Curated annotation (Swiss-Prot):
SMART domains: RPOLD. HAMAP family: RNApol_bact_RpoA. GO terms for cellular component: cytoplasm; DNA-directed RNA polymerase complex. This is DNA-directed RNA polymerase subunit alpha. Residues 1-232 are annotated as: Alpha N-terminal domain (alpha-NTD). DNA-dependent RNA polymerase catalyzes the transcription of DNA into RNA using the four ribonucleoside triphosphates as substrates. It catalyses: RNA(n) + a ribonucleoside 5'-triphosphate = RNA(n+1) + diphosphate. The keyword Thylakoid does not apply. One of its GO terms (biological process) is DNA-templated transcription. Belongs to the RNA polymerase alpha chain family.
Amino acid sequence: MKGYLKDFLKPRSVEIEPLSDNRAKVVLEPLERGFGHTLGNALRRLLLSSMPGTAVTEVEIEGVQHEYTAVEGIHEDTVDILLNLKDLAVRLNERDSVTLSVEKQGPGSVTAADIATDHDVEIQNPDLHIATITHEQPFKASLKIERGRGYLPVTAREEEDTRTIGHLALDASFSPVRRVSYAVESARVEQRTDLDKLVLDVETNGVVTPEEAVKFAASLLRDQLSVFVDLEGGLLEGGDEQEEPEIDPVLLRPIDDLELTVRSANCLKAESIHFVGDLVQRTEVELLKTPNLGKKSLNEIKDTLAEHGLSLGMQLDNWPPPSLGDRARIAG
């Protein structure tokens, strides 16, 4: 059986094509037929769900007691400021958590460059807009930044009745990977024309490079599968394995399968959101603009998506898929 493994092709080259500072294409070829989708789907899921990173988990803004407090002299609502801070990309070189402060005298724009950092803290997107001061007054805030992995809603970290007034907790998306897609193209080796070429398109927030992200995901996959290499016994016999689809089956499920409250489900359907894939592409800001959909319904939606390893604000390529059919787009 071990000798038979030598008959399988191994990739001969890995090419990295930078598309921008934080985006690159990683090309792997040649692969046996079907291996492109098998490896591509596994790497994509790991890149989106299992990459360690940092996120703002708690914010204190001078003069703000809760997220619905209107800040005099500030153009943005508190909710908008918190959503802006969610996009902050920070690299912690030594510590697992840190509290940073930001202070700016108005009028003017407050950006990530105004955040006071320590020697072991790096802001990767200093141009990030945080707030706009419209009067001659200061803007003061403190940010707690922590290491983590995946997506962690506030409800999974602490009970609502234990929070201190003025401490604004944020749902944390720790992954430094913003977007991942893959395509499988045809490859040829000598007379064989039925081979695969895997093309990964990876975009990060700058905390890690696309190359580093792919290396980490591949190492994680290797470590998780290594236990099977030492299994005793023969290989199971059975039919041919089904090729994994490029699109996560969960995304193809109707909204009703999420078992949301009737109010939340009806609000989503009124906005032509009929499938999970439709929902995850919407942002918190967009959903909060939905008539009759409040913060409570939004939290319910985020918690439910988190249970399936999903979150709002995801970018899906080639959505909707052709297999969804025309009937899906008019479902209600």
